[in-house]
A protein has these predicted regions:
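Membrane-embedded alpha-helical bundles of multi-pass integral membrane proteins
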Residues: 1-269
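Cysteine-centered iron-sulfur cluster-binding motifs in ferredoxin-type domains/subunits
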Residues: 270-279
Length: 279
């Protein structure tokens, strides 16, 4: 452990504190924007059923099964986003001491192979999604493409970040299990992993319209508060028209009742959540 590595560790810890602080401020700002929407009390009914539906749709990707190839790839990337969190925690210890592992589970062989399996499947998944998006972009240029008119730079950045993180995870595992461990190499890759991860938080915090990244945090809430808590799609029959959180009495409407959406202030908070999580 050299003074140079100590210096790098201090810088990365400060960088992380700034990045997470900025991220939390922007989460608060997004919450304020969404909560400023019109009331929709029905979204808070039957919380237990909603929680079950959310878990089912997230874990099984039931709404994406019709896109079999991309659904499987997306599922692995989603799992990797959560399951590889432990490797980021490990990296913060490794920039000080290359042999650092998470207490209790860090030396457990099944955990090591679990992380490796998730890292490799996430890598394959994100490469598959990149390939699918590029193929769709080049071979379906008509309005049938869901990417028509979209800006690709943000998607490229998210894809590159995910790929860089899993490459770091796989590389670190290789370096950690050499007969002669190169401490400098381990600490360097761990530092890169931290920098890439924190930079991602800073970039998405700088753009609250970056739904391709924000949906990773917002999707569970979007599913939990969906209109129907069964298999029916939201784009079915028209819902009861409400104003200020209450059904409109068309026989005797109030003077301040809002019929439909005439301006952004008329959008419900759920509608604003939908737009924020749109990819």
């Amino acid at each position: 452990m050299t003074s140079g590595i100590n210096y790098v560790a201090i810088v990365l810890y400060l960088f992380t504190a700034i990045g997470i602080g900025f991220f939390l401020l922007k989460v608060r700002e997004m919450y304020q924007r969404i909560s400023a929407g019109q009331s929709d009390p029905a979204r808070f009914l039957k919380k237990r059923e909603r929680a079950k539906l959310m878990a089912k749709e997230i874990l099984l990707h039931t709404r994406m099964l019709r896109f079999t190839g991309s659904a499987i790839a997306h599922w692995f990337v989603m799992i990797g986003f959560v399951a590889l969190l432990g490797t980021l925690i490990t990296a913060y210890g490794q920039i000080i001491e290359a042999s650092f592992v998470i207490p209790f589970i860090g030396t457990w062989t099944p955990y090591r192979y679990f992380v490796l399996a998730i890292a490799w499947t996430t890598a394959v998944g994100i490469v598959a999604l990149i390939g699918i998006r590029q193929a769709t972009r080049f071979f379906h240029k008509s309005r049938t493409s869901r990417f028509l008119g979209s800006r690709s730079l943000k998607a490229y950045y998210v894809e590159a970040t995910i790929l860089a993180v899993v490459i770091c995870v796989i590389t670190l595992d290789y370096l950690e299990h050499q007969y002669y461990v190169n401490a400098t190499a381990v600490q360097t890759v761990a530092a890169i992993k931290i920098w890439v991860s924190v930079m991602w938080f800073i970039v998405i915090s700088s753009d609250l319209t970056m739904g391709v990244a924000w949906h990773r945090f917002l999707a569970p809430f979007n599913i939990f508060f969906k209109r129907n808590i069964d298999s029916r799609p939201a784009l079915g029959e028209l819902p009861e028209m409400i104003s200020h959180g209450k059904p409109i009495n068309f026989e005797d409407p109030k003077e301040d009742d809002v019929f439909g959406i005439g301006k952004s202030a008329d959008i419900s908070w759920k509608g604003l959540l939908d737009m924020a999580s749109c990819t």
